[in-house]
Amino acid sequence: MASKKSYLDSLRKVSLFSSCSTKDLEKISKAGDEVSLPAGSLVIDQGQTGREAFIIISGTATVRRNGKKVATLSSGAVVGELSLLDHGPRTASVTTDSDCVMLVISQRQFLAVIDAIPALSHKLLATLAGRIRELDRQYFG
């Protein structure tokens, strides 16, 4: 595991957490477990029930929907949060392209962090709205 300072700096780069205080970043860090995944690991399987969200600390991953590549993600990306909010199935698959370090946060811990840091709710809504707009632009032009 990286030093506490560099780990918190990595979390600060996550768009969702960019306005969080150091104290809030420490809460987020404590809410999850760090995992190291080799290249080629299936992180999220489309259609499966989501039980956790993943924050990419280092490395890259590809998002595929129905087998079609829709995005490449890197440090600072959060994936899997949608299923945690609506208890629905995963909407895409995510596979690591390189060795990755991720913070894994369970549904219970994810919701507790949102409750403990109210500003995250607004930021999360803005992030999801941005994704909807991007999909709308891609689909309708």
Regions found by a protein language model. Give the residues of each.
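Cytosolic regulatory regions built on CNB/CRP/Popeye-like sensor folds
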Residues: 1-141
